[in-house]
Amino acid sequence: MTARELDAYFRSFLNFGPFVSCDVALNGLQVANSGAPVHKVAFAVDACAQSIDAAARAGARMLFVHHGLFWGRIEPLTGMQYRRVQALLTHDIALYAVHLPLDAHPQYGNNAGLAARVGLRQGGPFGFIRGTAVGLWGTVAENTTPSQEAMQQHAACTAPDTHRVTHANAISPSAGLSLQQVVHRLFPAEEQPVRLLPFGKQRIERVGILSGKAGTYLAEAIALDLDLFITGEIEHSCYHTAREHSISVIAGGHYQTETVGLQLVARKLQRDTGIETLFLDIPTGM
């Protein structure tokens, strides 16, 4: 497939439309290649010198990222930006970026992937940006394991509306998880959250998830009477706000919470097209 054909493929399911007015990122093909067929696609969180160099060493002809190079304004190709674009052109690598549509996708998105990890039963949309929901909230319980919920999400491929209306009140009020149980489910590969604010209930049921930098959405979590807010990165002011409203917060890391959707899309691409994929893990610790 060419880069243009891959652009059409990604657009066929990632649903850019709702985010045209609320996403400052340029979603889609940001830098083309020469038109040569793409037999390998590298996936990374950030378009940066490290990811471009790693993609080149791996022989990839496309780099698919969550954080691209262009963010809603005209940027001169000088300095760092010039070097990045020059490296892409030198190695004939197309750059493809998907920001909010990748966070929000109900099956292949960052938030859906995190929800599957913790075994979330979805209650409704959460994290509205100019009227468009990017995150989700729901409930967790000991009798809903991550693997069971992941299977439900897989089955939802042909019935996404059914998945969306699996309501929280289906779970017994006595069920719930401890904060450490949620952390263990969220980071099964021995990763660690950047910050925990353990100010909520001992047994957690109502959970909101919004990947990346979303500390400002703590107020929305409080308004929904959630027990736990899971995000990537928070502001200093979140500490006292969470403490005084008795809500726990997991700041899982901006990077760590945004690796999930990329890997889901990579698996789908390889399954659908046979194109080889690889994930470039370049953690920032943030």
Curated annotation (Swiss-Prot):
GO terms for molecular function: metal ion binding. Homohexamer. Belongs to the GTP cyclohydrolase I type 2/NIF3 family. The keyword Metal-binding applies. It comes from the Bacteria. Transmembrane segments: none annotated. InterPro entries: DUF34/NIF3 (IPR002678), DUF34/NIF3_sf (IPR036069). This is GTP cyclohydrolase 1 type 2 homolog. One of its GO terms (cellular component) is cytoplasm. A divalent metal cation 2 binds at H67, H254, E258. The lineage of its organism: Bacteria, Pseudomonadati, Spirochaetota, Spirochaetia, Spirochaetales.
